[in-house]
From Swiss-Prot:
UniProt function note: Formation of pseudouridine at positions 38, 39 and 40 in the anticodon stem and loop of transfer RNAs.
Assembly behavior: Homodimer.
Protein known as: tRNA pseudouridine synthase A
UniProt superkingdom: Bacteria
UniProt source species: Clostridium botulinum (strain Alaska E43 / Type E3)
Residues forming the catalytic site: D52
Catalyzed reaction equations: uridine(38/39/40) in tRNA = pseudouridine(38/39/40) in tRNA
NCBIfam families in UniProt: hisT_truA
Keywords carried by this UniProt record: Isomerase, tRNA processing
Gene Ontology process terms (BP): tRNA pseudouridine synthesis
Species classification: Bacteria, Bacillati, Bacillota, Clostridia, Eubacteriales
Annotated residues for binding of substrate: Y110
GO molecular function, one term: RNA binding
Family: Belongs to the tRNA pseudouridine synthase TruA family.
Cited Pfam families: PseudoU_synth_1
């Protein structure tokens, strides 16, 4: 028995998320089909994140147990010959049997990309969120500071979560701006269901002036979902890195 770790890049546009489903196309389903083709084994993969449909990844981590004699580093090339064009294995290696892509994780980094311009977009919409109203990016940057540290993020969670606790620690949160392209980066020890997308929606409210900068701390502390921003679309969201 061997434990194989994979680092995976995928374009989430045409997937119904990571987690396997009976009828819908998912990243996990395609990956497990590829493993079956090269090993002859029905392996169950563990993913570091359960991304939603439309969410992308530059470095999703997964692992699976196999009896195959294929060298760990060779799974990358072998799997890539069986995977669709919107999934790529960046790295593969054999790891200790104790390693688990999800439960061994110490944190994750996500990015979210916004294009802020009045004119409609002709292309690239599957990788970003278009905001037409002018955003005050300096206020958005200041708002990031309120989220840093350990907080109860109940106000930033969509219904349907099975999380045992809504307390999380955000370790890094910053914005990069290049002309009308705004990239938001957020790292934490874990994220609640739709937490990143709702936090970004709250930042957009700050940027448009709908939410006052000084009210952000109250939104966090009050824990009332309706006081936070909208859950922005998934297409601007990218899993950048998983920490171990």
């Amino acid at each position: 028995m061997r434990n194989i770790k994979l680092i995976i890049e995928f374009d989430g546009t045409n997937f119904c998320g990571w987690q396997r489903q009976v009828k819908d196309r998912t990243v996990q389903g395609c990956l497990e089909n590829a493993i079956l083709k090269i090993t002859g084994e029905k392996s169950l993969t563990n993913g570091s994140s359960r991304t939603d449909g439309g969410v992308h990844a530059k470095a999703m981590v997964a692992n699976f147990i196999t009896n195959s004699s294929i060298p760990g580093e060779k799974f990358r090339e072998a799997l890539n010959t069986k995977l669709p064009d919107d999934i790529s294995i960046i790295k593969s290696e054999e790891v200790d049997m104790e390693f688990h892509a999800r439960y061994s994780s110490k944190g994750k980094m996500y990015s979210y990309t916004i294009v802020n311009r009045y004119e409609k977009l002709a292309f690239g919409k599957q990788y970003l969120h278009h905001v037409r109203k002018e955003l005050n990016v300096e206020d958005m940057k200041k708002a990031c500071e309120y989220f840093l540290g350990k907080h109860d993020f109940k106000a930033f969670m969509s219904p349907g979560s099975s999380a045992k606790t809504t307390v999380r620690t955000i370790t890094d949160f910053y914005i990069e701006e290049n002309k009308n392209v705004i990239r938001i980066f957020i790292s934490a020890d874990g994220f609640l269901y739709n937490m990143v997308r709702i936090i970004v929606g709250t930042l957009i409210n700050v940027g448009t002036g709908k939410t006052k900068l000084q009210d952000v701390n109250n939104i966090i502390n009050d824990g009332i979902r309706k006081n936070a921003g909208m859950c922005v679309p998934p297409n601007g969201l990218v899993l950048e890195k998983v920490f171990y």
